[in-house]
Amino acid sequence: MSDVGQLFEENAALIALLNTSDRKRDSWPSIANSVEREGSAVRLLMHEIDPSANPLFDDEDPEDYENGCPTLFGDDEFGSPPRRRAELEQAREAARAELRTWADTGLDFISVLDERYPNRLRQVVDMPPFLFADGTMKQDELGVSVVGSRKATPDALAFARDTADMLVDEHLTVIAGLAAGIDAEAHRQTLADGGRTVAFIGTGITRQYPPQNRDLQREIGGRGLVLSQFWPGQPPTRYTFPMRNASMSGYGIATVVVQAGEHSGTRIQARQAQQHGRPVILRDQVAETTQWGRNLIGRPGVYIVSTVDDVRNALDDILNTDRIMQTALDQLIGAYAETR
């Protein structure tokens, strides 16, 4: 969606839906998927305000839904009650004001309806409905997550640096979470090598966490890209970091786990990568010393590595498989188009 005025209204409607949703019934990713499927947050919002006057689905495809026109937050064939309608309208007006404030202060808001939204992230079921960006967006870049313990050993830090070196040599983007330890080391080495790095943060875009990485975050924003899927002032919580890990997994083509303990948050990203169909490159020490690592051995898309050369070979295999699958997909799309 490239029309600025239309996108503004779509973004306002999306924010209104998010701010008035029942979080017990509707997660943000489910709302993002509903908006993506419908192709319009405005239509969803208007359907919430008056379902009978604003149907969502084409009458030619009634099998796509049951009970006529279900509302996002619950069915109501007689339309939303007046109080609910007023709440939605007020939320939309507040969202418009918020969007103007963000724009005036230089914050870059990118929703799922924005053509700049990362394509790979659109492919995962738990895609965030929006991102705040500081830096340069690249639509279809090939990136690899390098993640691991905050309290990393010298050996693990060296492995992270060498992996970042290799990724830069291969013209791949280095993705990490700006955490202390492995993540920060991968970011720093990439910048030192003149490569591109993307940081997914577990806070709002106006915050810096941990504080010691404040300068690093600014440098990444100036030379690469910092992304946040939270409201600008969101503080770090036990929930924001797993959500950030899921987005890192969806954004990249693979995840390299350098070091992690039995209860490390890194295991969440490894699990999410498996659910997303993204390969996991697991250092042998992690596979040998953790139960969750051992459980991944032998699974499709899981590579156990000992050296950075092993990581390179795994990525060669992953990229080659991606090319074969993309070629086959293009052929199928072409064949289908010829029948239309």
Regions found by a protein language model. Name each.
Residues 1-10, 19-25, 105, 111-340:
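Glycine-biased, small-residue-rich flexible motifs in mid-sequence functional cores and linkers
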Residues 1-113:
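Short, small/acidic-rich helices and loops at N termini and domain boundaries
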